[in-house]
Every structure is written in structure tokens, then in C-alpha cells.
Amino acid sequence: LHVGLLEYVPFIILLLALFTISGGVRLTGALVGTPIVNLAIILIGTFLASWMGTTGAAMLLIRPLINANKHRKNIVHIIVFFIFLVANIGGSLTPLGDPPLFLGFLKGVDFFWTTTAMFVPMLIMIIALSIIFYFLDSYYLKKESIKVETPQDKLKLGIEGVFNLGLIVGVIGAVLISGFWKPHISFEVYSGVHLELQNLTRDILLLILTYISWTYTPQQIRKDNEYTWFPIIEVAKLFAGIFVTIIPAIAILKAGTNGALAGIINAVSSDDGPVNIMYFWYTGVLSSFLDNAPTYLVFFNTAGGDPITLMGELKNTLLAISAGAVFMGANTYIGNAPNFMVKSIAESSGVEMPSFFGYLFKWSIPFLVPLFIIVSWIFFA
């Protein structure tokens, strides 16, 4: 019940708000999915992700990206790199970007600490993946032998449902309220389960914003977006299972050196202090298969849990934990919430996405792991 009311329900409410509001925004005009246009959309989303959340940026731009590539036969690689960059790595610069960083902010990490600390590792990942994507997309386009023609209608680019962008700002504000406002008022909804006022306020505001978007956005916009409830329902079902099954796994990790995973906890420390490269890899690998937010917290506390120390003399340790949690959320569909939502939206639009293990072994391991090795060698070795 504790996990359900205090973690799962707020999580789904946030996803519902972003999914509904972003579904009311439609990019109109003659946008054709060439390699440079696709890369531009992905990079715009990557930039936005740190400020409106990976989920918000992904939900805002996935449909325009798919629509721009309706003429293409093979766009799986486009969706995959969108997941890599927009749904994960792009959220590195602020606590608004990704849930693990927001938890760090609630624990006392400065709001802009990640902006400076994560900038260079993130930039390396973005530049490398952008170059790879451009040549890969160019290769697939050439292989398809499709002549990309400029549309005849010459319709200028525009945005329908623009008021929803204001609602997304409202979502960001509601999330920030729960982080900054501490009235120290809570309601006991069940024995030992307390709902804090700031979190209740956030969730109510998110539901109000969702209602406003659904009620006042012309339904034709959603129809043109091929909007359905299927992706959010599928994600709600999947993450219900994940939230239940991670409870024992996180409990074992929290047991530290006294638990069944004592080997992992021991591996990240030595007589000389934290072993940063191990913090990066263990946080990352576990974040790929568990929820990356509680995994971040476990290793944050393992490293001492003092934000002042972790931002000071142990700044590379905090960087390793942060980068591992955010970057490696891209390794699997369940590593970060928007991954599976993007997959579901793509599939509902007719794109044949790879299976769980197909994504892992064909895409994330070949393209991401070599870059993670380089990043870990540069910053944490």
C-alpha cells in the first residue's frame, strides 16, 4: 500500500498528465523526415528534456517525428535513437529532467549542480550518438531508394493546440511545488502510510491540468495525432508489476553488506574510499532493470548520503551515480518510463519495434555500451 499510494499512483498521474497534454499538441506543415530533419527534432527534444522532463519532451515530439517519416519504410532506428537521447540522456542537466536527479534534489543536492557536473559527459554522449545517427539514417534512406520530395502544399510549419504548452509549464510548476514547499502537514490514509500535503497538492494540480487539456483541446487535433489511451494503459499495467517486484530487490540492496547483494555494495568501496567506476556501472546496470530512482537513492546513501560531502570532495562519486542512473536508463524499455511509452506510441502508429531483448542486444549494447566504457574511462577510471 505504501508503494502504491506514495510512489506508483503519483508516478502514473504524472505520466497521464504529460501524455494527455502533449497529445493535444500537433506540429503542422511540410515536415519531411530527412536525416538532418530527424536529427534536428531529436536534438530539440534532447535540449527540452532537462527542462520539461524526459517524459514531457518525448511525448511532445514522438508523434511529429513519426508523422515526418510516414514515407519511410524503416524507422525503427529513428525511434530507438529518440529513446536514447530524448527519453534518457537529454534529462541530465536538472532535477526536472529525470526522477533520480529529482530525488537527489529532494535530498539536498543543489538544483544546478547537475547542470555543471553532468554537462561534459552528456555532451560527449550527445555528439557521439548524433554522428552515429546521422550516418545510420543516411544509410537506411539510401538503402530504401526513396526520393525525398518537398511537399506540394507548401504549408508553413505551425503548432495546433498551443495552449497545451502552457499546461506543460504548469506540470513543471506542480512538480517543483512538491520539491520546494514543505508545510510539514500529512494525512494518515492507512496505518503507517502518510500522504504529505505538498505531494497531494501536486497530484491534484496534475489531474486538473489533465482535465483542462482533455476538455478544451479540439478533439480533431487528437484525431490527427492518432491519439489513443492504449499506450498509457499499457504502461500503467507494466509498471504496476515493476513497482511490486522491485520492492524485495530494493530491500535487499538497502540491507547493504548484510544483504544477499553484499558483493555489490562491497565492490563500490575500498580502503581508499569510493570506487567511482564501479558506482557508475552498478548504478547503471541495476537502473536498466529496476526503477532507476530508488536505485539512485540506494547508492546515494551507500556513498554516505550527505549532499554537502557528495557535492564537494566526493563530487565524482555523485557524478558516477547520477550518470549511471540517467544514461543507462536507455539500456532497456523499462529503464525509464518514457521508453516504454515511446515504444507503445510507435507500435500504435504501425512501427514494428524490437522485442525487449531485441532492443537490448541489437541496439543498446552495440551503440551505448562502447560509449559508456569511454565515459567511464574518461571520468571515473
Describe every region a protein language model picked out.
Residues 15-23, 45, 122-134, 164-179, ...:
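Hydrophobic core segments of alpha-helical transmembrane domains in multi-pass membrane transport
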Residues 20-24, 56, 60, 98-101, ...:
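Juxtamembrane interface elements at the cytosolic ends of transmembrane helices
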Residues 93, 112-159, 327-381:
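Juxtamembrane and boundary regions of transmembrane helices in multi-pass small-molecule transporters
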